[in-house]
A protein has these predicted regions:
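His/Asp/Glu-enriched, well-ordered alpha-helical/loop segment
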Residues: 1-73, 93
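Extracytoplasmic low-complexity/disordered linkers and repeat tracts associated with LysM-containing
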Residues: 14-15, 85, 113
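C-terminal cap of metal-dependent C-N hydrolases
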Residues: 51, 63-107
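Short, solvent-exposed cationic patches
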Residues: 109-120
Length: 120
């Protein structure tokens, strides 16, 4: 039986899918419990959802001729401690900058007078 992990309501965050899949790998290690292998868990958030909606020939896995958005991780994508290194959408690198990274960069090495009045 194939298992897919996806968004089932608007309040659910898609960024948690790798964590949910990783949890199922951990459950498989509990004696008497069921869970997924690492490969099954990765497929549950990539190729299996594409197959379920009938798009398995176009999306869900990296093969020549298929459309792909790719995320590059600095470790195991199913581990909570792994971080995103790069994102490509339709082959184009995407910026990973966000409000938090811009604030970090702005105040990492503050210069004289660069801090807001409240911080001086």
């Amino acid at each position: 039986m194939k298992v897919a992990i996806g968004n089932f309501y608007d309040g659910e965050q898609p960024r948690y899918a790798p964590q949910y899949a990783g949890n199922l790998v951990g459950v498989a290690r509990v004696p008497g419990a069921t869970g997924l292998t690492w490969g099954e868990a990765l497929a549950a958030i990539t190729s299996v959802p594409a197959e379920i909606i009938g798009e398995g020939d176009h999306f869900g896995s990296l093969k020549p001729g298929r459309a792909a958005d790719v995320v590059v991780w600095d470790g195991d994508p199913l581990e909570v401690t792994s971080g995103v290194v790069a994102v490509y959408v339709d082959g184009v690198a995407q910026s990973l900058a966000n409000h938090q990274t811009r604030l970090r960069d702005r105040y990492r090495h503050p210069q004289e007078g660069s801090l807001p009045k409240a911080y001086q």
